[in-house]
Amino acid sequence: VTVHIVSFSGGRTSAYLVHLMEQRRAAGEDVRYIFMDTGAEHPETYKFIQRLVTEWCIDLTCIRMGVSDELGKRNHIEIIGVGDLKTDLYAWKGLLVKYGAPSIAAPFCSSRMKQELAHNYCVDQFGRGGFETWIGIRDDEPQRIFGRFAYRILRDNGMPAEVMNTFRLDVLE
């Protein structure tokens, strides 16, 4: 049985994915929801998340990074309650101390605070190959992800946006 892990960002498109996946969960599939908390979201985003959890009665696991002091040592996973979500820059401050400020040459924010952490959590909880991850992407995301030049080439050669999104998901796995 595959566990479907939906990485909820706190945005509208991501909420729509939660809505769609709730239909699959109601049909008997094993669907779980996670939120990767950076401590740097807008307060209204946190309110939206809390309201969605309450109104839709979903079980949302909120994960944030606990930064290990040692370079080379894996950062650890901290689970916090939905009611504890707030703009406190907790993980961000830890990253700055350990790695310094991110830059174009070293853009580690999303990879360290979201992607690696989500992957490590899922492997720890469900084992390698025991889960499938889902993310909601806005229609304008392929252009940002691929870059304007590559996006135009793909689009002008007939690749629909939904295929680009699927390709992006395959690349991330």
Task: Map each language-model feature to its residues.
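Nucleotide-activated chemistry modules centered on ATP-dependent adenylation/adenylyltransferase
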Residues: 1-173
